[in-house]
C-alpha cells in the first residue's frame, strides 16, 4: 500500500485553479476572467486575464458603461479590454506553432473573437468553468469550435453563477493577501525576492 496523499488536485483541477487565480489579477469590477494554456505534457505555456493593453492606465478608462471618462456610453470597456484568452495567446513568448494541440482552461466560455484566435493558433481543447451570458454568441462560438474540431469540455456544471465563481476567486485573493501580510514573499530563482 502506498503512503501517497490521496486528496491532491487532478490536472484539470490544477489548471482550472490556475485560471481562477489568474482572474484575480483583473481589475474589471464586473467580469474577472482568467485563462491558462497547457501543452500535452501538462506544462503551462502561458496565462492571461482580461485587462487593458500594456501601457494603458487602469484609472483613465471606464470599467462601466457610464462613459464618464471617455465620453463613450455603451459597453465602453468592450472597446479597450483585452480578453483573457487573447492575452494568454499574446503573452506566449515561443512560436505560435507550439500552441498547436494545446488545451485552454478558461473561467468563462470564449466569445466569438477569442474563439477565432483559439482556432487560428491550433488549440485543440477548451475547458471552461462558466458559460458566457450572451447565448447567441455562445452558439456561434460552439459552431466554430465544432467545425474546427476543437473539443469543448464544461468543467463542473453549466449553471454555476458568476457570484459563485467570484466567491472562490475572492477566497484565493484573500489568502494571497494574508500570506503577503504575514511576510511571505515569492522567491526568484534568478536571485533575490520580487
Positions of predicted regions on the chain:
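Zinc-dependent deaminase catalytic domain
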Residues: 1-194
Amino acid at each position: 500500500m502506498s503512503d501517497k496523499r490521496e486528496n491532491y488536485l487532478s490536472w484539470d483541477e490544477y489548471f482550472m485553479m490556475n485560471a481562477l487565480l489568474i482572474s484575480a489579477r483583473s481589475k474589471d469590477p464586473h467580469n474577472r476572467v482568467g485563462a491558462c494554456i497547457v501543452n500535452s505534457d501538462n506544462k503551462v505555456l502561458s496565462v492571461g486575464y482580461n485587462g487593458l493593453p500594456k501601457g494603458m492606465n487602469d484609472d483613465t478608462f471606464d470599467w462601466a458603461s457610464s462613459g464618464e471618462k471617455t465620453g463613450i456610453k455603451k459597453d465602453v470597456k468592450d472597446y479597450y479590454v483585452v480578453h483573457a484568452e487573447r492575452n494568454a495567446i499574446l503573452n506566449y513568448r515561443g512560436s505560435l506553432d507550439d500552441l498547436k494541440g494545446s488545451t485552454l482552461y478558461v473561467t468563462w466560455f470564449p466569445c466569438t473573437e477569442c474563439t477565432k484566435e483559439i482556432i487560428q493558433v491550433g488549440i485543440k481543447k477548451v475547458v471552461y468553468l462558466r458559460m458566457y451570458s450572451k447565448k447567441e454568441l455562445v452558439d456561434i462560438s460552439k459552431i466554430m469550435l465544432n467545425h474546427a474540431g476543437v473539443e469543448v469540455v464544461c468543467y463542473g456544471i453549466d449553471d454555476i453563477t458568476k457570484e459563485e465563481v467570484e466567491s472562490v476567486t475572492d477566497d484565493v485573493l484573500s489568502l494571497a493577501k494574508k500570506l503577503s501580510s504575514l511576510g511571505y514573499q515569492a522567491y526568484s530563482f534568478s536571485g533575490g525576492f520580487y
